[in-house]
C-alpha cells in the first residue's frame, strides 16, 4: 500500500510504520483530534489536577479556571508525564498543565484513546523544553492513524480493552 499527502501544492508519498487494509483511511491525528484550552469561567469549583485525578491528593477548590465537564478527556501537556490522558470524573477546572482533548464525533472515542495510549511512551520520551518539559505537539499532531470503518473501530477498541484487562 502507498499513501500520499498533499503538502502545499505537491503530492508526496508518505512512509508509514504499518500496513493498513485497503478499506481504511489514513489521516494525521490533528485531523480527528485537537488540543484546546477549554472555557474560561469564574466561580468556585474543584481543581482537577494530575495528583487529584490519580487519587494521590484530596480535592481543592479554586475561584476560576478553564472549565471541563464530567466525561471530557484532558491530556497532560506539561511535565514528565506529558501525553497522559484522563477522563474527567466530575465537572470542574482542569489543572494548568492540561489541555482539553477534542475528538471528532465521527470517530469511536475509545479507539482514538487506545491509539494515543499506544504512543504514550513515545510522547513521554519526546518532550520539548529543558526546565519544564512540554508535550511535543508536532509529534502528537502528525502521528498517522489508520481509520477503519466505525464498526471495526468499535471491535478493535473492545478487543484492546479485553486484552488490557488480562494484564491487570
Please report, for each region that a protein language model flagged, where it lies by residue:
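Short amphipathic alpha-helical signal-transduction/dimerization elements
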Residues: 116-120, 124, 164
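A short beta-sheet element
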Residues: 54-56, 65-117, 127-129, 140
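Interdomain signal-transducing alpha-helices
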Residues: 112, 119-120, 153-156
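DNA target-recognition patches
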Residues: 5, 30-61, 69, 73-75
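Non-catalytic DNA-recognition/assembly elements of restriction-modification systems
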Residues: 9-40, 49-53, 150-158, 163-168
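Extended, domain-scale alpha-helical bundle/helix-rich regions
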Residues: 1-11
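Short helix-capping and inter-helix turn/linker motifs at the boundaries of alpha-helical repeat units
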Residues: 6, 88, 131-135
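Catalytic cores of nucleotide-enabled group-transfer and carboxylate-activating enzymes in metabolic
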Residues: 18-29, 85, 103-110, 133, ...
Amino acid at each position: 500500500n502507498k499513501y500520499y499527502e498533499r503538502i502545499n501544492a505537491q503530492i508526496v508519498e508518505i512512509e508509514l510504520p504499518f500496513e493498513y487494509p485497503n478499506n481504511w483511511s489514513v489521516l494525521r491525528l490533528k485531523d480527528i483530534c485537537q488540543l484546546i484550552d477549554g472555557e474560561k469561567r469564574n466561580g468556585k469549583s474543584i481543581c482537577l489536577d494530575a495528583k487529584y485525578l490519580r487519587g494521590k491528593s484530596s480535592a481543592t477548590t479554586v475561584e476560576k479556571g478553564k472549565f471541563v465537564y464530567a466525561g471530557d478527556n484532558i491530556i497532560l501537556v506539561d511535565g514528565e508525564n506529558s501525553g497522559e490522558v484522563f477522563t474527567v470524573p466530575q465537572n470542574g477546572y482542569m489543572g494548568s498543565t492540561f489541555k482539553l482533548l477534542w475528538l471528532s464525533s465521527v470517530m469511536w472515542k475509545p479507539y482514538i484513546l487506545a491509539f494515543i495510549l499506544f504512543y504514550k511512551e513515545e510522547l513521554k520520551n519526546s518532550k520539548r523544553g529543558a526546565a519544564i518539559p512540554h508535550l511535543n505537539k508536532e509529534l502528537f499532531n502528525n502521528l498517522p492513524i489508520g481509520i477503519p470503518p466505525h464498526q471495526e473501530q468499535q471491535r478493535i477498541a473492545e478487543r484492546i480493552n479485553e486484552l488490557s484487562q488480562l494484564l491487570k
